[in-house]
Swiss-Prot record:
It is found in: Cytoplasmic vesicle membrane; Cell membrane; Cell projection, Dendrite; Cytoplasmic vesicle, Secretory vesicle, Synaptic vesicle membrane. The lineage of its organism: Eukaryota, Metazoa, Chordata, Craniata, Vertebrata. The chain crosses the membrane at residues 235-255. Plays a role in short-term synaptic plasticity in a subset of GABAergic neurons in the brain. Its main location: membrane. Glycosylated. One of its GO terms (biological process) is establishment of protein localization to organelle. Residues 1-29 form the signal peptide. The gene is LAMP5. GO terms for cellular component: cytoplasmic vesicle membrane; dendrite membrane; early endosome membrane; endoplasmic reticulum-Golgi intermediate compartment membrane; endosome membrane; growth cone membrane; late endosome membrane; lysosomal membrane. Keywords: Cell membrane, Cell projection, Cytoplasmic vesicle, Endosome, Glycoprotein, Membrane, Signal, Synapse, Transmembrane, Transmembrane helix. This is Lysosome-associated membrane glycoprotein 5. It comes from Pongo abelii. Glycans are attached at N35, N53, N126.
Length: 261
């Protein structure tokens, strides 16, 4: 009986140790992130690569800026006026997490005064031609500290606030492809600071949170509508010029073959 009584706690301790080991392994996997922003020729653009088990599972290149309204006292110290802080995403610490249907990127900077979390989901839709998978940016959360003096000057009720997206469906892309968009895009975030809306401005975006085949290599790009329209506007004059030139050549050729009498 004594041996059995001693064996049970040993088994329990072993289970606890295994659970702790599993938890630590998950934490280590989440923190396997590489910040390659130094490779970018654009000083405003950041590059993040999340790896799990030695394999790239999320890649993100983008420039981000946050427009944050906050209250300060007017010169009479009676009225409140609204100022605006422009906060750029800088090259700080980061945490990533990958999954089959959910992936996440978190970035912290200025001693964790600011934190950005981006959640991506992959979904299947029943279409007339059969099931179709897409992925999208489903949630953005931005945490900021208005007592941080670099961007905020004498903010009233200074402290940490959280701004969240609401029913977000952005960067929608067919599964297996990366999303690319050079144009600026804005996302509105409702702040815990009463009656304040934070604006997130994204640009020079190239993201793939799922189905990466080769390390550090994006899959085929799915371009945003704005970029496609701008590309068409750039190439259309060239196409029209070529057509006009061809018409002139054909007209001259016909004129020489059939000269007027």
């Amino acid at each position: 009986m004594d041996l059995q009584g001693r064996a049970v706690p040993s088994v329990d301790r072993l289970r606890v140790l295994l659970m702790l080991f599993h938890t630590m392994a998950q934490i280590m996997a989440e923190q396997e992130v590489e910040n390659l922003s130094g490779l970018s020729t654009n000083p405003e653009k950041d590059i993040f690569v999340v790896r799990e088990n030695g394999t790239t599972c999320l890649m993100a290149e983008f420039a981000a800026k946050f427009i944050v309204p906050y209250d300060v006292w007017a010169s009479n110290y009676v009225d409140l006026i609204t100022e605006q802080a422009d906060i750029a995403l800088t090259r700080g610490a980061e945490v990533g997490r990958c999954g089959h249907s959910e992936s996440e990127l978190q970035v912290f900077w200025v001693d964790r005064a600011y934190a950005l979390k981006m959640l991506f989901v992959k979904e299947s839709h029943n279409m007339s031609k059969g099931p179709e998978e897409t992925w999208r940016l489903s949630k953005v959360q931005f945490v900021y500290d208005s007592s941080e003096k670099t961007h905020f000057k004498d903010a009233v009720s200074a402290g940490k606030h959280t701004a969240n997206s609401h029913h977000l469906s952005a960067l929608v892309t067919p599964a297996g492809k990366s999303y690319e968009c050079q144009a600026q895009q804005t996302i509105s975030l409702a702040s815990s600071d009463p009656q304040k809306t934070v604006t997130m401005i994204l640009s020079a975006v190239h993201i793939q949170p799922f189905d990466i085949i080769s390390d550090f290599v994006f899959s085929e790009e799915h371009k945003c509508a704005v970029d496609e329209r701008e590309q068409l506007e750039e190439t259309l004059p060239l196409i029209l010029g070529l057509i006009l030139g061809l018409v002139i050549v054909v007209t001259l050729a016909i004129y020489h073959v059939h000269p007027q009498k």
